[in-house]
A protein has these predicted regions:
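Structured surface interface patches that mediate subunit assembly and partner/cofactor docking
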Residues: 1-7, 14, 20-151
Length: 151
């Protein structure tokens, strides 16, 4: 039940952002704690949670993502998810991430911003005021993952 409520809360939040963008009005502020949880859901559930039949291969680099207003931070390893679905037989080979344990990897790049800006950015709802530094290849890999969209 908790997973469903969490998912619905973030879906409703992004639908609100979409409605404001469509109406051409400024996007209202997002609750920082809800936005930070939204970041966590994208990174840990939507991108990093792999099916049992899939494997992960590291690629472009390690990125630290920091919400400057809440103090939350995540370190991710970019990579490829590959495998064949045991349900459909479809073969996958697509960008993915793996969450790193805090302090386990030195980041190649950093991304910083408010939780609200980062959450919207990960959902491909604009650049907001995101600070990026470090490896261009790692940042480009993350940008490609964001451009592919959250599913």
């Amino acid at each position: 039940m908790g997973f469903t409520r969490r998912r619905q809360a973030h879906e409703a939040l992004i639908h609100r952002v979409d409605a404001e963008l469509t109406a051409g009005v400024p996007v209202g502020s997002l609750d920082p704690e809800l936005a930070a949880d939204g970041i966590d859901e994208v990174l840990s559930v939507m991108w990093a949670e792999l099916p049992a039949w899939a494997s992960f291969s590291p690629t472009e680099g390690v990125i630290r993502i920091e919400a400057t207003d809440t103090g939350n931070a995540w370190t991710i390893q970019l990579g490829q998810m590959s495998g064949t679905s045991t349900n459909t037989g479809k073969t996958y080979d697509e960008p993915s991430v793996r969450l790193c344990e805090p302090g386990s990897h030195e980041p190649d790049a950093q991304v910083r911003g408010s939780a609200s800006d980062l959450d919207q950015w990960l959902w491909n709802r604009g650049n907001q005021r995101i600070e990026r530094s470090g490896s261009r290849a790692a940042l480009d890999g993350l940008a490609a993952l964001i451009a592919a969209g959250v599913q």
